[in-house]
């Protein structure tokens, strides 16, 4: 594997300096006439695309924002069910940090949006239980009690902070909070940088197999432990900066990209938003403009299909605010270069899913269950459960019955692919099948200590699987061997002789890839340099 280390990065920059030769020659296209021309075309109406359009709104330029589907928001996706109309069901991003996510907070104020506490945070003491190897444990028991893992004497003595203990043994780091610059400089005993090791390699150096399994049970999902993931990714998640004040938006997380798009459109009649367009190819004309070839699409019940109708648009500059999983399919020659492809290869997309179910009552908090909890984290395929409160309109209660990732998402997606739908299921891509419902309630009955027959049937349900085009995952993680801070500079401008820029969360920072803030940070990085 070609590692993106410091030397290679410097070499890449030398190769790309303006005025020097480049092997990435643009395709020149003649013939087809543009249906219209704009100063800037922004492709993708998720957080990074709508924020880009918002920042350009008063620059005296003609800007058009394009979106593949019929929905603004990307991986922020607030939905509703008829029997709990006042509950925002967050099928994508659902929370943000009050202080750490600074751009998000500023935009909330600028756009006059309101926020509120995200009640459960990441699982609070006294409200959260863990279900591992058939045993239900409180947070306190997981950190200091008898756990169903055969930990060594050393591991047992450091049970409350086993990840920190392992990192100290690996690298000598003994700080309270691990920062990104610190993590990228850490070395292990054989002289390698920590980011060059997979999490399995790192933990196998200092821990027992049972200790590693215990950490998996303590983690949020499976993301940090999939094959090939960088050890830095894991230790930053577990030991990086954490904030207790966690918020969500009163009108749902989709309200932010929608408000950004609305403000953009209202600022000038020359701006436009065009939904249901897939960018097929990008090339340069003889007069120096960029020709964007779009295919018209149609969206029905969450499924988007392509037509054979083209829409040709010319632009002076292009901002590609689309996920890498869609970007790699774009016909644009600079994306085929070895350096850019190696940068693309630096991250893995994580398939994720959420399944919401509603019930007449919040049975998971009732006296009928042995292990009541507002949040459950488990090694079972449902991964995580969150209480989602009760409707003030109907009194019906909602839960995230499953918040899963990786193989657990694929397992559930297969169950949800065919068969009868539950009563009250959302249609199309957001359906919930009887098979999926039965599997999840069977798992939850074990975690809560209640007979499956004593759990009432759900009144409605909706699901979202982030696993197919254009989103092959809800977030990305860094692979071992790649320096995250160098890689992002290559992705944001794949060709230094072109005014084509890439924004989005997939390659930003070393740990923020799962947050909307990272999408905003990528926009700030690009605009500071090029706009």
From Swiss-Prot:
Proregion residues excised on maturation: 23-29
Tissue expression pattern: Collar tissue.
Keyword Glycoprotein included in the entry's annotation: yes
BP terms from Gene Ontology: defense response to bacterium
Annotated Pfam families: Amino_oxidase
UniProt entry tagged with the keyword Glycoprotein: yes
Job of this protein: Antibacterial glycoprotein.
Name under which the protein is recorded: Achacin
Protein's organism: Lissachatina fulica
